[in-house]
């Protein structure tokens, strides 16, 4: 087992080389052991070519420790967090390579409502090395959480003016859900590379890389759209293009989001990292 896959905030490696069936089933057993018997966890995956295999195997490992599994299928990463909170599960795992190159995959994990990171990830590794697993028989249930997520999001949305939007899911998980949401709220939109495809035929889904945003930029300008939004492969990261075709980076987006929060919830505290490029400037402009 390549111990370098156990990183600070997730487990990640080359799917065929590092995330073999033996490694994955043992990660599942270790995760199930820290969750505890007779508990329930939600498990979802992205559309990478290796994800179905990895999901099937890790579910097998988790269930072998007496933990019940809610299999929520192919979903964006935020839906695993939604499932954990909505259905009050005891944890969750998202199988995803995120914005990394095609051959990668990995795991984002929660115990209870909290993300597993740092020493907790290293503890998983030690359980695997020592092979100290709980033993039991957990149930596996296939569950649809997308409809509940859609209802929740739609109830929280309020569109103040009509906009024309171009989106580029990059053939990742965002396409079906985002297009459905935009249709339901009556937004005029164009979708590029909407169909989920783990080969990522258009470009790697990483909206922080300017060259991967070129198609979106050109479409925003040619269609005279108000905004363009690009997503990464598991839909927990976005890149934004303004109406002139310029990239709007995360430091500026923070100010936009903070301003909206303060408008609706005056007096709220906005916490930022001071490694953030505009952390000093943002409060002065809100």
Task: Tell what function each PLM region has.
Residues 109-112, 239-243:
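Short beta-strand-to-turn element immediately C-terminal to the catalytic PLP-Schiff-base lysine
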Residues 193, 246-265:
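Gly/Ser/Thr-rich active-site loops/lids in small-molecule metabolic enzymes
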Residues 29-37, 218-219, 259-263:
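A short, N-terminal amphipathic alpha-helix
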Residues 1-58, 64-65, 143-163:
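An N-terminal, well-structured beta->alpha segment
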Residues 275-282:
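Conserved small/polar residues in nucleotide/adenosyl-binding loops
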Residues 41-104, 187-241:
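N-terminal small/polar loop signature for handling phosphorylated ligands or for N-terminal nucleophile
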Residues 41-43, 80, 167, 266-271:
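Conserved PLP-anchoring active-site segment centered on the Schiff-base-forming lysine
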Residues 105-223:
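Gly/Ser/Thr-enriched, mixed-charge loops and adjacent short helices
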């Amino acid at each position: 087992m390549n111990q370098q896959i156990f990183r600070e905030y997730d487990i990640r490696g080359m799917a065929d080389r590092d995330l073999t069936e033996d490694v994955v089933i043992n990660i599942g057993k270790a995760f199930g052991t820290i969750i505890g018997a007779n508990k329930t966890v939600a498990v979802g995956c992205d559309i990478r070519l290796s994800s179905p295999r990895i999901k099937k195997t890790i579910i097998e490992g988790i269930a072998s420790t007496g933990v019940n599994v809610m299999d929520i299928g192919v979903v964006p990463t935020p839906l695993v967090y939604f499932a954990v909170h909505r259905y009050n599960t005891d944890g969750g795992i998202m199988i995803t390579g995120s914005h990394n190159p095609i051959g990668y995959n990995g795991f984002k994990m929660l115990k209870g409502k909290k993300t597993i990171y740092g020493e907790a990830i290293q503890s998983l590794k030690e359980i695997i090395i020592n092979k100290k697993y709980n033993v039991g028989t957990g149930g596996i249930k296939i569950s649809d959480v997308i409809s509940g997520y859609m209802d929740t999001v739609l109830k929280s949305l309020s569109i103040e003016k009509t906009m024309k939007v171009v989106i580029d899911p990059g053939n990742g998980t965002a396409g079906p859900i985002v297009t459905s949401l935009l249709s339901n709220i009556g937004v005029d939109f164009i979708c590029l590379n909407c169909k989920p495809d783990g080969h990522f035929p258009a470009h790697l889904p990483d909206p922080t890389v300017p060259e991967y945003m070129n198609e979106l930029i050109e479409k925003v300008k040619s269609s005279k759209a108000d905004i363009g939004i690009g997503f990464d492969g598991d839909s927990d990261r976005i890149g934004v293009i303004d109406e002139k075709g310029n990239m709007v980076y995360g430091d500026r987006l923070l100010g936009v989001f903070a301003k909206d929060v303060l408008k609706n919830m005056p007096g709220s505290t906005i916490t930022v990292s001071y490694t953030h490029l505009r952390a000093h400037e943002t409060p002065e402009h809100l």
